[in-house]
Amino acid sequence: MSVDGAHGDDDDATQREIVRRAYASTAMNAGSCCATPALARVKIGYTPEEQRFVGSSDLGVGCGAPTSFANLKPGESVLDLGCGAGVDVFLAARKVRGTNGRRGRALGVDMTSAMLDRARARAREMTLDGVDVEFRLGELESLPVESSSVDVVVSNCVINLCSDKRAALREAFRALRPGGRLCVADVVSRGKELPPALKTNEALAC
């Protein structure tokens, strides 16, 4: 998909609903469309120890490990765009645990309620001292996040699914504090725009 993602409102809504259905199904079936979650984790760079830590929150739908490259520091605030079941939120939370009384913060936003249900359930099972973990329902093109409120924005194989990528990136930069950092793992189509038939193919929505 191109960066512009210029479509009509009806096309945007259709594409968004296709993606929502695909990921709701993944959340309920606890499986990746690309590989088994365990195999997918190995392929994209999570360490064995990280795999054990995140447990059932990783459904194998990412395409990288952005928290490995974001240079996260204790006490920072991190936002994960399209957090799914929370894998990168939990990994970020562990890295930004506060010290000397300053708490870290890890916030995930996703438009799929079923994914957020899994993320919140996993959060209740974990012990994460020195950091606040939160999940919010929302869309990347209109984030339910305050302006200039986070130090780092991460995203894992989600922005490519947005029909309006410019809006999603504008929102990411709106949420960042001055001097903040953006670390994204994603897939990019070089060259021509994808045909409409591929954009609306539910089998490719993951």
Cite the ranges covered by each PLM segment.
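Conserved alpha-helix/loop element of class I SAM-dependent methyltransferases that forms part
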Residues: 38-77, 91, 95
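Short, glycine-/aromatic-enriched active-site segment of Class I SAM-dependent methyltransferases
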Residues: 188-206
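A short glycine-rich, Lys/Arg-flanked "PGG" loop and its adjoining helix->strand segment in the class I
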Residues: 97, 166-181
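N-terminal auxiliary segments of SAM/dcSAM-dependent transferases
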Residues: 2-43
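A short acidic, Gly/Pro-enriched loop at the edge of an enzyme's catalytic core
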Residues: 141-153
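A short SAM/SAH-binding and catalytic strip from SAM-dependent methyltransferases
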Residues: 151-164
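Class I SAM-dependent methyltransferase SAM/SAH-binding core
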Residues: 74-142
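Acidic carboxylate diad motif detector
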Residues: 184-186
